[in-house]
Amino acid sequence: MSLSMIELAMQILSCSQKELASKLSVSPTQITKWKKGEYMSFDMENKVRKLLDIGDLDPNVILAFGHISHAQKWQKIITQLAKSANDNGETGFKVAPLIDEADFVLSNLVDSLRMIGYKFPLSFPPELENDYDHYIDWSDSFIETIYSNEFCSLIYNIFRSFVDVYSFYVAYISELDTQLLIENSEFSSLIIDIEASLLNLAIIKADTELPELRGFQKLKREIEKDYREWLQQLKLYAFKSNIPLRAELLHLIDDEHDNLGVEAEAEYLGFNDNRLHPDIYMNELLIGMRLLHQVLPVILDKLEIKDFDIDNESLRKF
């Protein structure tokens, strides 16, 4: 945040590093430290925001769109696209980040798209100008104009993917740690990691042209690698803790986002009430076999059966 804040300040104020230091009453050396990523205090951040008159806008978002007014207008449109994606979702689950944390989602989205080399529109199309603050007040023709816009279509498709991915997470993963009899910080940390990267997972699953970008495949490899590792560990913890799974968690990586949405909807509607993941059945079988291994010698001894030959041929009969 400190690097982007300084970059934005020098851009908006059209000043040198030395001049900016004077305006902020700090040394030029401190500006250099911030540019290298050193933490900027909350009070200093507020001072810079007030100087630039950017309110609560993320400086990275402003830099991406090239101008404060453009960023504000796109923020308004994207916030409504997020709400629309949630409302049009068919999983039954509320996708809380799209409703309650739209600004945070926008910041993460901008960071991820910039990372893979996406070029944001540096102007705001006049046909998207609108005085209404909520998409339910938009006319049909204006909505059609929005979805025909290439950038808006991209964002909406990512959000639709996020609805399915997040719903699967809520349906099958988010509350697993509450079922632990003994608190396990590593188990809880895994679930936090899984949730934190869901937007990136949605980006690589969305039906877009982003795979053509130079950085997309790198992001895809990293995200799939991380999730495979996290989910395998999570399954192992669940198995050892006798926590039932109602779905194969690796579907989160391997399946298309539409299929994840269908699985989430099935859980929401209660279709999985009597279904358990095969790992749970296997665990029950293993426990039963171990119990027999403990009990049988005691039974044989009590019955004074000393010589017992195993009939291997009969074991192979069905």
Map each language-model feature to its residues.
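A short, Lys/Arg-rich alpha-helix, primarily the initiator
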Residues: 1-13
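Short alpha-helical "recognition helix" segments of helix-turn-helix
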Residues: 9, 16-24, 31
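Recognition helix of helix-turn-helix/homeodomain-like DNA-binding domains
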Residues: 24-40
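DNA major-groove recognition helix of helix-turn-helix/homeodomain DNA-binding modules
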Residues: 42-60
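Helix-turn-helix/homeodomain-like alpha-helical modules used for DNA recognition
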Residues: 61-134
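Long, charge-rich C-terminal accessory regions
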Residues: 111-277, 281
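Alpha-helical oligomerization segments
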Residues: 260-318
